[in-house]
Amino acid sequence: MDTTDLKSRVKDYWEREVCGSRYGARLQQDRKRFFQEIEKTRYEQDYMLRDFARFEEARGKRVLEIGLGAGTDFVQWVRSGSIAYGRDLTVASVDMVKEIGRAHV
């Protein structure tokens, strides 16, 4: 398999399933609860992440997140008062982060 084909397959996979979104899958109809469940599960499973990232220390700082996934960490940067920018390989992930913003989760 050449690298172009592999990259295409990886991108297609993440377009179909945004990283982390399966945590809220059972709540698809209630989008606010969907995003809340993703966040709750993320920080229960990766319980050291908040201490590592130190979101609260980002106030007023510029942050670039590469690989937005379901947007859970990106939202933490925004909530902390940082000037946050994000990039992702997939349109699905970027759209999900925009939806979180519109839902004010």
Give the label of every model feature segment.
Residues Q29-K61:
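Conserved alpha-helix/loop element of class I SAM-dependent methyltransferases that forms part
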Residues M1-Q36:
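N-terminal, positively charged/glycine-rich alpha-helical extensions of SAM-dependent methyltransferases
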Residues L6, V10, E17, M48-D51, ...:
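Alpha-helical packing segments of well-folded alpha/beta enzyme cores
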Residues Y23, F35, E44-D46, G67-G71:
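Short hydrophobic/aromatic-rich motifs at helix boundaries and adjacent loops
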Residues V18-C19, E39, G60, S82:
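Intrinsically disordered, low-complexity regulatory segments enriched
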Residues A58-R102:
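Class I SAM-dependent methyltransferase SAM/SAH-binding core
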